[in-house]
Amino acid sequence: MNDIATLNDNFRKTFTGGQVLLTAGIAAMSSEDKANIVSLVQNFDNFTPDNDPYGEHDFFSIDYKCNKIFAKIDYYDLNYEFISENPANPDITNRVLTILLSCEY
């Protein structure tokens, strides 16, 4: 596993080192559904060459109550103004995990 994948896994599991955003479609769900979806995202570990061709663990989908949910990690500078110059360097990178319905992509 590469450095970016390790950093992405740690962030996804702990939410440390960045921000988590829920889109309007996810935010409109019940508290129970949101908690279940967040738990599924944090515990996802089924990365394969088919769904993670670059090996960075930065995007995946899950199914929840007949909804396809996407989870996507993007890389920003420490002020969240620009794209990070080096996502493998946590000293200059903040991560943003967006959890969204597939229809919101």
What residue ranges belong to the model's regions?
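Compact soluble domain cores
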Residues: N2-I62
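Short, compact, well-ordered microdomains
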Residues: F59-Y105
